[in-house]
């Protein structure tokens, strides 16, 4: 079992550090090199791999400096996106061996067209596709693509730990409660999130099991969720409900 640590960056990013038992590690989506280098030095760790989910600068901005500090590091990322530092270009179905664990690459377009995720060891690193109680904005893809990406994630085991790249949970929960004000799981989660954030403790990782109970973007077949967007849709199929939710969240 790999050990995962969060390295905060910018206002609300999480850079995930994946560590094995002999001081070797990888990082996921290092938008800023400085906090990573400080953590590596303080803990006497050697960086062996960088995993990238998509090309936005708050996810890749620190890669060049990390490569300079660790010239032999592998840089793994999406084949379909313009990331010049890649040494290993990956796409749906590819496999990655990381400290004795096999990670599968998932194609997760929507937020960006080439966005990928990494799933293995009971963990999903999903960048900006799925957040706790929310999902990413659709910048390059279509609502249909994002819906399919989330549907793909939904098929993973429910105990899968979800490591997304931002601490957006409190604002996401506020929206989720506007969608489902009577959801008791959400009300309890709001209290849990407020307590954790009051102590400056991350709300991430979450689990897929929890998200299926509280995340409106994964609940497009739920009657209360459908009812909440009735005045925004002509058809109540799950993708139309999801699309209406995403448009509502954009203006929330």
UniProtKB/Swiss-Prot annotation:
It catalyses: an S-(2-hydroxyacyl)glutathione + H2O = a 2-hydroxy carboxylate + glutathione + H(+). Its EC number is 3.1.2.6. GO terms for molecular function: hydroxyacylglutathione hydrolase activity; metal ion binding. Binds 2 Zn(2+) ions per subunit. The keyword Hydrolase applies. Pathway: Secondary metabolite metabolism; methylglyoxal degradation; (R)-lactate from methylglyoxal: step 2/2. It comes from the Bacteria. Its cofactor is Zn(2+). Transmembrane segments: none annotated. Zn(2+) 1 binds at residues 54, 56, 111, 128. Belongs to the metallo-beta-lactamase superfamily. Glyoxalase II family. Thiolesterase that catalyzes the hydrolysis of S-D-lactoyl-glutathione to form glutathione and D-lactic acid. Monomer. This is Hydroxyacylglutathione hydrolase. It comes from Vibrio campbellii (strain ATCC BAA-1116).
């Amino acid at each position: 079992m790999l050990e995962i640590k969060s390295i905060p960056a910018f206002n609300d990013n999480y850079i995930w550090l994946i560590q094995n038992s002999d001081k070797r590690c990888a990082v996921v989506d290092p938008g800023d090199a400085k906090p990573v280098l400080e953590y590596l030095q303080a803990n006497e760790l050697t960086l062996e791999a960088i995993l990238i989910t998509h090309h936005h600068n708050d996810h890749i901005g620190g890669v060049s400096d990390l490569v300079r500090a660790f010239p032999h590091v592998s840089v793994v990322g999406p084949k379909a996106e313009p990331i010049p530092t890649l040494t290993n270009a990956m796409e749906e179905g590819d496999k990655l061996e990381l400290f004795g664990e096999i990670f599968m690459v998932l194609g997760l377009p929507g937020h960006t067209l080439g966005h990928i995720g990494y799933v293995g060891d009971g963990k999903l690193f999903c960048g900006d596709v799925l957040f706790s109680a929310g999902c990413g904005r659709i910048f390059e893809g279509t609502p249909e693509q994002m819906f399919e990406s989330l549907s793909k994630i939904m098929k993973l085991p429910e105990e899968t730990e979800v490591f997304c790249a931002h601490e957006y949970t409190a604002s996401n929960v506020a929206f989720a409660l506007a969608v489902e004000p009577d959801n008791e799981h959400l009300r309890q989660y709001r209290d849990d999130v407020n307590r954790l954030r009051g102590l400056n403790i991350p709300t991430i990782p979450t689990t897929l099991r929890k998200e299926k109970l509280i995340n409106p973007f994964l609940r497009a077949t739920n009657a209360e969720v459908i009812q909440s967007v009735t005045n925004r849709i002509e058809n109540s199929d799950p993708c139309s409900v999801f699309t209406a939710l995403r448009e509502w969240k954009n203006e929330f």
